[in-house]
């Protein structure tokens, strides 16, 4: 148990080391291009079931963290996220693509005019926001057959304020914490499994 505790401490230090490297990259924002973001949605069953699609691509990057959120008149809700990273963020950069999908259900028209924001971060970040429009007239008998609507450039609206600041460090900390957390959990799970097997012998 003592060894496991020491190893966990080492893992935490290593994770914090990775945090410093990536946070520095976020602060200077150089070395790779911001992720590309594309979005689409379907509003089915008389505008009761809203399905949102968010594709994020980052090239030649140490990692990609992406997510989506929706802002209705009364509240903002974080929907989903995904993280992929290189084991050697300093030297090994890859091409990443995330395809996020999330479905929301509510009374007819609940999410009409709500704003949806999709983003991706690889040390710098890209984000896009659109307003949900009714699809009642785009369905077959207004029941269940809807056409996926791909969001066009002229449909985009301003991103929320924290995406527009010249200094995004506070927001970047939230996203990059996901990367460190995933690394820590994977390593901690491995240590626990190794310790358990050793004591079984």
Swiss-Prot record:
Cytoplasmic side: 192-201
Protein's UniProt keywords contain DNA-binding: no
Signal peptide: 1-25
Membrane topology: Single-pass membrane protein
Protein name: Uncharacterized protein UL120
Positions on the Extracellular side per record topology: 26-170
Tree of life domain: Viruses
Family note: Belongs to the HHV-5 UL120 protein family.
Glycosylated residue positions: 46, 49, 55, 84, 95, 113, 122, 137, 144
Compartments, as annotated in UniProt: Host membrane
Assigned keywords, A-Z: Glycoprotein, Host membrane, Membrane, Signal, Transmembrane, Transmembrane helix
Gene expressing this chain: UL120
Main location: host cell
Species of origin: Human cytomegalovirus (strain AD169) (HHV-5)
């Amino acid at each position: 148990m003592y060894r496991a505790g020491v190893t966990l401490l080492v893992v935490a230090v290593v994770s914090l080391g990775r945090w410093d490297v990536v946070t520095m990259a976020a602060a200077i924002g150089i070395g790779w291009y911001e992720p590309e973001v594309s979005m689409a949605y379907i509003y089915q069953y008389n505008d009761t079931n809203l399905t949102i699609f968010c594709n994020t691509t980052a090239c030649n990057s140490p990692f990609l963290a992406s997510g989506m959120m929706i802002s209705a008149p009364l509240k903002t809700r974080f929907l989903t996220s995904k993280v992929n990273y290189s084991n050697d963020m300093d030297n090994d950069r890859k091409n990443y693509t995330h395809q996020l999908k999330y479905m929301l259900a509510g009374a007819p028209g609940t999410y009409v005019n709500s704003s949806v924001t999709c983003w991706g971060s690889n040390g710098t970040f890209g984000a896009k926001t659109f307003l949900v429009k009714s699809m009642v007239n785009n369905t077959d008998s207004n029941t269940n057959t809807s056409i996926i609507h791909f969001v066009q450039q002229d449909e985009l609206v301003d991103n929320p304020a924290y995406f527009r600041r010249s200094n995004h460090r506070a927001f970047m900390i939230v996203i990059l914490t996901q990367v460190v957390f995933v690394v820590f959990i994977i390593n901690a799970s491995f240590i626990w499994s190794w310790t358990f097997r050793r004591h079984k012998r």
